C-alpha cells in the first residue's frame, strides 16, 4: 500500500537521493505486481539551481522529497510543457499547486520515458504527427481517385447531333461545345492546330465555328436571330425586291476616275462652277466628295474619288455605288498605271464607262494616241467600233462640258435607272468623320427610299436617330430622295466607309443589332489576331533580328484617308520582308493624350494626316520626346515612310581598296611578334581605319588589322607608295617574305527599300 505524501520543510540533498531511490524501487514493484507502467518521475536527477519555489509534490508510488531546500517541486516533463494532457487512469498523478502536470501511465504498454532535459518540443510534435498522412501520401491518394474509372451510373455518352447544327452568328467555345456535343478541350485543340489560341470563354464567329466542326464531321447552318431577319446586306437585292409599279426614275450617280493630276477635280469644278480644286492640298483630292448638279432640269450626282494610287480602296467603293464612270485621261500624258487600275475597277463593278480626254487645248495633246492605248487595254471607243463613248473636253477652258453632261444623261436613259422613293431609306456611307463640335458626321448616298428627319437608322455597327441633314452646299434638308448625297448628324458612333444605312422602326432594336455586330466584329478580329500570333513567323523573325518593325499610330480627318494609308503601308510591307510597318492604332479625329501615351509605351511614331494634336497631347509629346509627323499629301507620307523603313534596314558595306605592298624582310621581336618590312607598291597604308589582307601565291591566308606602323624608329600615321616601312599585323605571326599585302576600308552604304 502506498504511503501518503508528506510535506518536508527541512530536506537536504541526501534526503533527496533517498527519496529518489525509494520512488524507483516502488515503481519497479508496481510494474511487477500490477502490470501498469507509471512515468518514473524520479528517474532523472534535477539540479539544485532549477528550484521553482514551494509547493506540494505528489508521486505515483511513494514519497517524493524536494531536491532543494525551500519547498521546491520537481520540474514538469518536456512533453507536459508542450501542451499534451495527461491520460486519466487509476495511477494518474495529482497536479501540483502551481498548475504543473505529469504524464499519466499508459495502460497495457511499456513505460514511456519523459524526455530528457533540453529535448526540443518539435521532436515531440513530429512524433505525435507521424500517424497523420503526409502531403506525398495525400497526393498519391488524389491521383488514385482521379485514375479511378467512373461508375456506370455517372457515365453519360456524348450524343452527337444528327443533321446540321444551327449556330448563332457569334458564340463562345463553351456554347459551341454544348450545341455540338464536342468536348471543349477537343475544340480548343483543333483551334490550336489551326493556329488560333483561345480559351473556353472566348467568342468566335460562325465561320470559324463551321470550319472547326468540319474536322469532326458535323454540318452547321447559321441561325439568324429573329431581329436580324430583314436586315439589308446588299443594296442590289433591295432594289430587285421592290414592286415594279412603285419604281420611279432616279438621277444617275457618276464617279470620276483617272490618274493623278489629269484634271478630275478641275473637270468637276468646271461642271459645278465652283473652286473645289483650289481648296485641296497640293491639288489632289484627299477624300471622296459627293455633289449634285442640275442639268436641263435633271439632276446628276457626282462622286469625286482621289486620283493617287494609294486610294485604291476608296476608288473601289466609289465604283460599287456608282451608275456611270467618267474616265479622265490627259491628252498630253496618256494612259498611266492609275488609269489602268481605274479601268480594272470599272470592269469589276460592271458599270458603263465614258472616256473624257482632257486638256485638248494644249499643243502637245494627242487624242488618237490615247484611244490606241485604251484599245490595248480592251477599252474600245465608239470611233474605233466599240461601245465606249468618248468626249474631248478641256476643264481649264471649259470646252465641251455640256457635251459631256449630255452624254451622261444619254447613258443614264439607256440604263433605265429606277428606285422606289416610298420605301424606307437604304444607302451607303461614302465618308464618315468625327467632328469636334457636331460629333459623328457621315456622308451617305441614298440608293432606295427616302430618308427623313427623326428616322431611326442602323449603319453598320452603330445606330442613331437622324437629327439633321445637309446637302453638299450646306443647305438643311428635311428629306433626301434616291441618288441624293446628304451629310447626316445623329449617329451614336463613327461608321465605316462602305457601311449600309437602313431605316429601322425601333431604335432599341437597332442598338441591339449594332451591339451584336460589334461583338461579331471583335470575335473576328480576335480570331484573326490569334491566327497571326500563333504562327509567330513575323514575331520570331523580329526577335531573331531578321525583321524589324516600325510602329505607327495613325490619326486622320476622315475614314477614307485611314483606309488609303493602311493600303499604302500594306503595299510597302509586301514589297520587302526585312522591315515591317505595323499600325498599332488608328482613328478619326484629333491626336489625343491617350495616343501619345500609347506611342510612349509602344515606341511608335504618330502620323497626323489632316489631324492635329490638342494642347494637352502636344505638351505631353514634347515632354516625352514623342515624334509626331503631320501630312496633308499622301505621296509625301509615302516617301517619308520609305526613308524611315530604309533607316531600319541593316547597313550594307562596300569594300574600297586603298593600297598594296609586298613583304621584303622579316624581323622577330622578343615579344614573339613579327615585324614585316614592306614596300608600298600602290596607294597608301594608314595605321587606323584600314584592314589588311595577307595573300600568299594569290590565296588569302589572313585578314586583320594593323597594330603598329613605323618608318625607321618613328611611329607614322600613313605611308604612301614608293616608300618602305615596318608593320605588325595584329594577331598574325606567320607572315613570310614574298607575301602580298592588300589594304582596304569598309564604307557604309545607305540601305534602300
Curated annotation (Swiss-Prot):
Residues 394-396 are annotated as: G5. Residues 358-361 are annotated as: G4. It is found in: Cytoplasm. Keywords: Cytoplasm, GTP-binding, Initiation factor, Nucleotide-binding, Protein biosynthesis. Residues 258-265 are annotated as: G1. Residues 133-146 have a biased composition (Basic and acidic residues). Residues 19-43, 71-81, 102-122, 153-162 have a biased composition (Low complexity). Residues 1-166 are annotated as: Disordered. Residues 283-287 are annotated as: G2. Its main location: cytoplasm. One of its GO terms (molecular function) is GTPase activity. It holds the Pfam family EF-G_D2. This is Translation initiation factor IF-2.
Amino acid at each position: 500500500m502506498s504511503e501518503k505524501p508528506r510535506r518536508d520543510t527541512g530536506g537536504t540533498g541526501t534526503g533527496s537521493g533517498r527519496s529518489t531511490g525509494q520512488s524507483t524501487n516502488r515503481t519497479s514493484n508496481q510494474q511487477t505486481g500490477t502490470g501498469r507502467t507509471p512515468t518514473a518521475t524520479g528517474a532523472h536527477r534535477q539540479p539544485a539551481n532549477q528550484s521553482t519555489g514551494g509547493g506540494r509534490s505528489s508521486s505515483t508510488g511513494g514519497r517524493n522529497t524536494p531536491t532543494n531546500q525551500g519547498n521546491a517541486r520537481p520540474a514538469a516533463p518536456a512533453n507536459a510543457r508542450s501542451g499534451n494532457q495527461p491520460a486519466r487512469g487509476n495511477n494518474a498523478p495529482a497536479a501540483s499547486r502551481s498548475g504543473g502536470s505529469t504524464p499519466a501511465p499508459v495502460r497495457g504498454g511499456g513505460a514511456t520515458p519523459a524526455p530528457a532535459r533540453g529535448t526540443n518540443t518539435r521532436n515531440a510534435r513530429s512524433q505525435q504527427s507521424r500517424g497523420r498522412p503526409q502531403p506525398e501520401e495525400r497526393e498519391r491518394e488524389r491521383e488514385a481517385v482521379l485514375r479511378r474509372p467512373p461508375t456506370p451510373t455517372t457515365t453519360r455518352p456524348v450524343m452527337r447531333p444528327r443533321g446540321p447544327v444551327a449556330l448563332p452568328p457569334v458564340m463562345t467555345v463553351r456554347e459551341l461545345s454544348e450545341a455540338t456535343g464536342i468536348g471543349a478541350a477537343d475544340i480548343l485543340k483543333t483551334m490550336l492546330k489551326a493556329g488560333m489560341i483561345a480559351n473556353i470563354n472566348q467568342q468566335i464567329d460562325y465561320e470559324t465555328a463551321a470550319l472547326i466542326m468540319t474536322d469532326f464531321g458535323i454540318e452547321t447552318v447559321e441561325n439568324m436571330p429573329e431581329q436580324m431577319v430583314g436586315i439589308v446586306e446588299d443594296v442590289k437585292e433591295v432594289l430587285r425586291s421592290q414592286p415594279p409599279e412603285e419604281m420611279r426614275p432616279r438621277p444617275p450617280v457618276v464617279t470620276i476616275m483617272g490618274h493623278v493630276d489629269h484634271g478630275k477635280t478641275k473637270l468637276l469644278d468646271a461642271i459645278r462652277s465652283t473652286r473645289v480644286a483650289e481648296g485641296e492640298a497640293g491639288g489632289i483630292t484627299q477624300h471622296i466628295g459627293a455633289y449634285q448638279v442640275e442639268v436641263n432640269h435633271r439632276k446628276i450626282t457626282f462622286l469625286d474619288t482621289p486620283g493617287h494610287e494609294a486610294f485604291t480602296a476608296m476608288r473601289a467603293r466609289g465604283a460599287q455605288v456608282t451608275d456611270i464612270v467618267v474616265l479622265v485621261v490627259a491628252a498630253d500624258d496618256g494612259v498611266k498605271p492609275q488609269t489602268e487600275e481605274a479601268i480594272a475597277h470599272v470592269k469589276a463593278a460592271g458599270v458603263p464607262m465614258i472616256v473624257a480626254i482632257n486638256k485638248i487645248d494644249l499643243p502637245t495633246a494627242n487624242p488618237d494616241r490615247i484611244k490606241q492605248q485604251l484599245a490595248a487595254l480592251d477599252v474600245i471607243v465608239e470611233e474605233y467600233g466599240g461601245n465606249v463613248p468618248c468626249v474631248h473636253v478641256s476643264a481649264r477652258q471649259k470646252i465641251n462640258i455640256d457635251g459631256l453632261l449630255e452624254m451622261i444623261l444619254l447613258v443614264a436613259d439607256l440604263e433605265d435607272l429606277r428606285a422606289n422613293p416610298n420605301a424606307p431609306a437604304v444607302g451607303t456611307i461614302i465618308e464618315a468623320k468625327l467632328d469636334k463640335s457636331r460629333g459623328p458626321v457621315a456622308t451617305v448616298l441614298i440608293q432606295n427610299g427616302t430618308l427623313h428627319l427623326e428616322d431611326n437608322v442602323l449603319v453598320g455597327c452603330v445606330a442613331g436617330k437622324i437629327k439633321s441633314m445637309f446637302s453638299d452646299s450646306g443647305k438643311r434638308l428635311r428629306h433626301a430622295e434616291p441618288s441624293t448625297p446628304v451629310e447626316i448628324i445623329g449617329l451614336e458612333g463613327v461608321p465605316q466607309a462602305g457601311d449600309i444605312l437602313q431605316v429601322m422602326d425601333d431604335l432599341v432594336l437597332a442598338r441591339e443589332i449594332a451591339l451584336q455586330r460589334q461583338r461579331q466584329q471583335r470575335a473576328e478580329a480576335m480570331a484573326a489576331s490569334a491566327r497571326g500570333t500563333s504562327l509567330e513567323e513575323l514575331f520570331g523573325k523580329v526577335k531573331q533580328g531578321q525583321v524589324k518593325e516600325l510602329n505607327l499610330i495613325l490619326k486622320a480627318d476622315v475614314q477614307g484617308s485611314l483606309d488609303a494609308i493602311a493600303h499604302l503601308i500594306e503595299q510597302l510591307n509586301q514589297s520587302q520582308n526585312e522591315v515591317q510597318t505595323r499600325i498599332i492604332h488608328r482613328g478619326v479625329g484629333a491626336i489625343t493624350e491617350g495616343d501619345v501615351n500609347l506611342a510612349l509605351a509602344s515606341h511608335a511614331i504618330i502620323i497626323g494626316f489632316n489631324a492635329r494634336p490638342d494642347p494637352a497631347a502636344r505638351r505631353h509629346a514634347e515632354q516625352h520626346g514623342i515624334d509626331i509627323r503631320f501630312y496633308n499629301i499622301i505621296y509625301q507620307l509615302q516617301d517619308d515612310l520609305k526613308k524611315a523603313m530604309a533607316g531600319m534596314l541593316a547597313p550594307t558595306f562596300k569594300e574600297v581598296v586603298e593600297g598594296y605592298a609586298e613583304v621584303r624582310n622579316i624581323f622577330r621581336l622578343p615579344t614573339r611578334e613579327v615585324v614585316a618590312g614592306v614596300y608600298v607598291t600602290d596607294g597608301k597604308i594608314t595605321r587606323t581605319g584600314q584592314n589588311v589582307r595577307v595573300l600568299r601565291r594569290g590565296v588569302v591566308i589572313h585578314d586583320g588589322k594593323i597594330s603598329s606602323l613605323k618608318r625607321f624608329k618613328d611611329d607614322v600615321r600613313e605611308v604612301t607608295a614608293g616608300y618602305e616601312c615596318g608593320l605588325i599585323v595584329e594577331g598574325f605571326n606567320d607572315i613570310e617574305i614574298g607575301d602580298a599585302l592588300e589594304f582596304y576600308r569598309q564604307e557604309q552604304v545607305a540601305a534602300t527599300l
